């Protein structure tokens, strides 16, 4: 009996140890397989990310004219491929893949990185200026959003900047600015000569172009935006107002006055860009803001508002009187005008029409809630601050990621999204 019991115990332990050994062998094998799988996945991902960086470097360095390329190669024991495609004139998509081990081998894994590139819009700046001329930021000045000067950054006192500051030619003056963001010198972002012409092209392709029939004779268009998504307008050659739906007048949201001036105010419902082109020598290509320009859904209280306006001039954008719309002398300029828009003055500036007229005192502030880009920094008041408007510029954060229709771009590509 003892011998039989001992034998049973031995057989039992033998079976138990056999099963245990088999289990731990399987665990060890699975661990190795899992490690190999993880190594292959992470290596394939690293190759894909590196390939995306190679593609980005080639794109930013060479700026291919056909806006597309394709290449492949070997890396880290695996292989990669990069392909760039143009979705539309403002959007490029790059697809980078990494494979490890190389395709055809056991356990081969492929990972993909997709990157979207787009041209940066000028409305991403809180304030952009080609040159500051002899003007300087000083104590009491506050700039919201990023600021760029393509010339020098002139500073006196302690102005405050709530955003990144960049300049092409360094800092002048003895000031000590307070910058709640980064500062970088030697950054060149020129204003392209094609900014306004690109808007005209967009207006001619699905928008509205209002031509001056007697160019270079004076020609003015007077336009009022209505909160019901219509626009009322007339020209200096026709005293009768016409009211039409914006979607009918300009389906793509772009209106261009060719060889003329534009006078504009009202409440924008929808998304619109209005522009004026023409030669400064004939006094054309200007936009006159003759009253409040607001969004139907106020972005100051509703950051999700989809109403958006762009104001583009080949030369200057002026703040003017409401009476200009009525054809009367500008005797009563608006007090505390509000402009909710992105403003772009390609060869000129944004400034106040009444800056040196002693008749216009106690006008308050001009509040621009949006973005300003101009060739040179303009003024809205005289040096004593007695006339004109005190400037108050606030950046509309919606413009960080969205722009009015066909709004001018810097021509410089930037990464819009990176998907891994």
Locations of the language-model features?
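Sequence/structural signature of small/polar-enriched beta-strand/turn repeats
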Residues: 16, 161-175, 185-194, 292-307, ...
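Beta-strand/loop motifs with alternating small/hydrophobic and polar/acidic residues, enriched
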Residues: 2-151, 419-420
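Short, ordered "entry" segments at domain starts
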Residues: 88-93, 99-208, 249-250, 254-256, ...
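Aspartyl protease catalytic domain
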Residues: 183-260, 265-267, 278
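Protruding loop/beta-arch "assembly-hinge" segments enriched in small, turn-prone residues
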Residues: 392-420
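Extended C-terminal subregions enriched in glycine
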Residues: 302-369, 373-386
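Long, well-ordered mid-to-C-terminal structural blocks that present hydrophobic/aromatic surfaces
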Residues: 247-320
